[in-house]
């Protein structure tokens, strides 16, 4: 998905601004997916006893080309360097070329949030300052806090992107009614 867009965006019709907006969105999502995989399948970057130069990351898929060869696993350092590069490139492209019209598209505010989370997760001393910087940029440019008393009437509460101004980006989807616990007093009669 993301690599197809990145590899072929120059060949599609549209203005340079539209192409750069697509490139920014695809690059941000590629970095996001690599980060999600790293969070699940890799050792923590700054964990005790972990050397990012020798610890293995997840395979970096940077092109849409498929081969029969198994992809190699780069070092954790190389993986995180590529994720950071994707996020920074995407942030620059999105700041200059695109403002999303709904919460299901990524824009520069989502890029700031993801960069902040990336730096927190990587966790180096210099990374924490960058996490604060990008979180501040997200807060400055992003949505205002919602009044919680206005949201409690919905099943989804603060997660309702139609009601809450705090939602920066939504991806995936599932029913809140199926996955939410609703307390009940139906079993009170069992207790004497």
Role assignments for model-derived ranges:
Residues 1-41, 74, 91-99:
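Conserved, well-structured interaction surfaces
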Residues 2, 35, 80, 87, ...:
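Inward-facing hydrophobic residues that define packing positions of alpha-helical scaffold repeats
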Residues 15-22, 29, 56, 79, ...:
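Structural signature of alpha-solenoid helical repeat junctions
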Residues 22, 29, 36, 107-109, ...:
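"A position-specific structural signal for the A-helix of alpha-solenoid helical repeats
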Residues 36, 40-43, 121-125:
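Alpha-helix C-terminal capping/termination sites
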Residues 40-81, 129:
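Short coil/linker segments at helix-helix boundaries
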Residues 57, 105, 132-192:
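Hydrophobic-face positions in mid-chain alpha helices that act as interaction patches
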Residues 109, 114-145:
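Aromatic-residue-lined binding/catalytic grooves and analogous aromatic/hydrophobic interfacial grooves
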């Amino acid at each position: 998905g993301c690599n197809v867009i990145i590899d072929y965006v120059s060949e599609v019709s549209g203005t340079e601004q539209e192409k750069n907006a697509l490139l920014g969105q695809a690059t941000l999502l590629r970095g996001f997916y690599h980060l999600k995989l790293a969070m699940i399948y890799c050792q923590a970057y700054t964990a005790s006893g972990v050397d990012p130069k020798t610890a293995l990351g997840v395979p970096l898929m940077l092109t849409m080309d498929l081969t029969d060869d198994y992809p190699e696993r780069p070092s954790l350092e190389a993986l995180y360097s590529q994720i950071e590069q994707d996020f920074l490139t995407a942030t620059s492209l999105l700041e200059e070329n695109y403002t999303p019209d709904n919460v299901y598209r990524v824009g520069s505010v989502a890029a700031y949030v993801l960069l902040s989370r990336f730096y927190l997760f990587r966790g180096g001393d210099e990374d924490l300052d960058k996490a604060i910087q990008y979180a501040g940029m997200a807060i400055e440019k992003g949505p205002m806090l919602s009044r919680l008393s206005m949201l409690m009437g919905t099943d989804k509460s603060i997660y309702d992107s139609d009601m809450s101004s705090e939602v920066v980006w939504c991806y995936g989807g599932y029913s809140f009614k199926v996955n939410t616990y609703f307390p009940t007093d139906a079993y009170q009669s069992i207790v004497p």
